[in-house]
Regions:
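Function-dense linear segments that define catalytic or interfacial modules
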Residues: 16-118
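Coil-to-beta-strand transition motifs
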Residues: 22, 164-167
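Conserved, charged catalytic cores of large soluble enzymes
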Residues: 1-31, 105-144
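Gly/Pro-rich active-site capping loops and adjacent beta-alpha segments
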Residues: 38-39, 168-170, 174-180
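Short acidic-glycine loop/turn motifs at beta-strand connectors
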Residues: 29-33, 62, 162-164, 171-175
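Internal maturation/activation junctions in enzymes
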Residues: 75-95, 99, 110, 115-164, ...
Length: 180
């Protein structure tokens, strides 16, 4: 295990962040150690200050069938809902805004790889459209049913553009190829 100096992935990401600004790390020390709350990401925007979003990504490059994809989206959406119940937050106001909005951001990554596996051009096509319909419908259905089960507010948002630089780089997938 060891310290951060032994973590190759972390060091690779830090080097790239220093060179390009991606992935979007937030280091809160030194002059920034007293920062209260910041949102370095812009995948999901909100009119509410103090809003939070629980982000995650489904990796299309590793999914082989529509049934498997439906299951991944279903479980991923439920997982993100549970994250809104368990995450510790820094301020009471953030808890209140989270309860009001329960903002989720299930993204898709590996779209480029998915297209290459199927020898499809990088454009919207009939097969991709079917997958995106499942993504839209199942993410909302699963999240709403799970929220209703716990008698909590339904999310105001379900999906986000992904992968972010951070998630894509960590997973070793192409970043900034998002079809939404």
């Amino acid at each position: 295990v060891g310290g951060l100096e032994n973590n190759e992935i972390f060091l690779k990401n830090v080097r790239q962040a220093m060179e390009t600004g991606e992935p979007g790390f937030s280091f809160n020390f030194g002059a920034k150690q007293n920062e209260t709350l910041r949102n370095a990401c812009t995948e999901v925007t909100s009119e509410d200050d103090s809003d939070v979003c629980n982000l995650g990504s489904a990796n299309l490059g590793n999914i082989r069938s529509l049934d498997e994809f439906r299951s991944v989206v279903h479980l991923g959406s439920k997982f993100l809902v549970c994250g809104t119940l368990r995450a510790d937050l820094p301020y009471e106001k953030v808890y209140k805004v989270r309860e009001k909005n329960r903002r989720l951001g299930l993204g898709l990554m590996g779209i480029h790889e998915w297209l290459l596996q199927r020898q499809l051009p990088y454009e919207v096509n009939e097969e991709l459209t079917k997958w995106l319909e499942i993504y839209e419908n199942e993410s909302e259905k699963a999240a709403n049913e799970h929220c209703d089960r716990f008698y909590i507010s339904r999310p105001v948002a379900y999906r986000a553009i992904a992968p972010t630089g951070s998630i894509g780089i960590l997973a070793g997938y192409v970043v900034a190829c998002s079809v939404q």
